[in-house]
């Protein structure tokens, strides 16, 4: 698994937009699969949470090298998906994350900062 990624979270579907939300899901799966096949991302996955009174309802995680992830989230494909999602779903969010060795390095830098205080 790659050490960098972006998480796209979302809440409930806006009333009356359920069909379009399903179409968006299908489109985003296609875009993500194509990005992996073309080497633009290493992998991706998605999780739906059990119903709750608070968001998020689910998350899609996109993994790759830092430059891959940055290029992908700047792409027109990704920006269009996020724009459509914002019109169809409540509480759409996009956040970068680190994992694996990058997580270890991040905590190492944090530890050095603490020691410098």
Please place each PLM-identified region on the residue numbering.
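Conserved short beta-strand edge segments in small beta-sheet-based binding/regulatory domains
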Residues: 80-98
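Residues that flank catalytic or metal-binding motifs in active/ligand-binding sites
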Residues: 56-58, 88
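Short S/T/G/P-rich N-terminal loop/turn motif that feeds into the first structured element of a domain
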Residues: 1-56, 64-74, 96-117
